[in-house]
Regions:
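Alpha/beta-hydrolase active-site loop
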Residues: 10-31
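Alpha/beta-hydrolase-fold enzymes
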Residues: 30, 34, 49-163
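Short beta-strand immediately N-terminal to the catalytic nucleophile in serine-hydrolase-like folds
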Residues: 39-41, 66, 202
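Gly/Ala-rich beta-loop-alpha elbow adjacent to hydrolase catalytic centers
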Residues: 40-45, 49
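Short beta-strand/loop motif that positions the catalytic acidic residue
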Residues: 195, 201-203, 207
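Conserved alpha/beta-hydrolase "acid-adjacent" motif
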Residues: 208-214
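Catalytic histidine neighborhood in serine/cysteine hydrolases
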Residues: 215, 220-237
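Catalytic histidine-centered segment of alpha/beta-hydrolase-like enzymes
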Residues: 234-248
Length: 285
């Protein structure tokens, strides 16, 4: 849904879940001629997808969550500890639209040495070579370009609509209502037990933003009999873009999804009815 502007400051989580996401799902269902579709959400988008699947289970065939927080009562990540003491009202009332740069600053401070010093020292070490080695220089040029592309993507964090940020921080981070089935959107309770479709919960073992403790409880919170967890030895960003992890993450999701995407004549996939936790052997790039 792009980058929010001043006119979007009053959009709520309900607007995103029951508005934008629901409209997108309905559009795909109509164009594909299906009753249900597979929904995959990443990080905060995964949390919104969980809410959507709980409120509209009749439209979701399979639910895939990727590094998605649902349990915010954890001390494994600084983000969760800090959030409990933040004056959310003061932040939202001051900014209206919460700047993405402000959020990025907070993310960097969760692991400042690694994220602000170590990785930049590392890139210089990676591109060191003999000045007369033309092949090495060409490889380094592409290495630097890829590094800068990644930096641009990482720091391209859209601002957040104020009221959405207010509710997400208060109801999720501070009150932990979602996992307790006490969160409400437009007066309707989000009950995770309504999620009965096949679930794939994908995590990064070394995630500093969404520790596994924040994601694992989803499996017990839903009523799905067909649910699986995949854990990859990467960080929060590495699970998307690490060269080695990409050889495992996407194929792993595809292997899980393929047998569950077969139609049984009603728009439903044929679940395999298993519960399993597997850890990938991929290395972090």
């Amino acid at each position: 849904w792009g980058y929010p502007t001043g006119m979007d400051r009053y959009l709520t989580i309900d607007d995103y879940v029951n508005g934008y996401v629901n409209n997108a799902v309905d559009n795909i269902r109509e164009k594909a001629g299906l009753d249900k579709i597979t929904l995959l959400g990443v990080c905060q988008g995964g949390t919104l997808s969980v809410m959507y699947a709980a409120l509209h289970p009749e439209k979701v065939k399979n639910l895939i969550t990727l590094v998605t927080p649902v349990n915010f009562d954890t001390n494994k990540g600084l983000l969760y500890i800090w959030a409990r003491g933040l004056d959310i009202d003061r932040i939202v009332d001051y900014y209206g639209i919460v700047p993405g740069d402000l959020l990025n600053s907070g993310f960097l401070l969760t692991d400042p040495f690694r994220l602000m010093i170590d990785k930049y020292v590392g890139i210089f070490e990676r591109i060191e070579c003999n000045p007369n080695d033309t092949a090495c220089s060409l490889r380094n040029e592409e290495t630097v370009k890829n590094f800068l592309r990644m930096e641009k993507w990482i720091f391209d964090s859209p601002d957040q609509a104020g009221e959405t940020f207010r509710q997400f921080m208060k109801d999720c981070y501070q009150k932990n209502l979602l996992i307790k089935n006490k969160m409400e959107l437009n007066g309707k309770k989000v009950n995770l037990k309504k999620i009965s479709m096949p679930l794939l919960n994908v995590m990064a073992e070394f995630d500093h933003l969404v520790p596994n403790d924040a994601s694992v409880p989803l499996n017990d919170a839903v009523s799905s009999s067909d649910k699986e967890t995949l854990i990859f030895p990467t960080g929060h960003i590495g699970i998307f873009v690490g060269s080695k992890s990409q050889k495992e993450v996407c194929p792993g999701i595809a292997r899980w999804l393929k047998p569950r995407s077969l139609l049984d004549g009603t728009g439903n996939g044929k679940g395999k009815g298993k519960r399993e936790v597997r850890k990938s052997q991929a290395s972090e790039a």
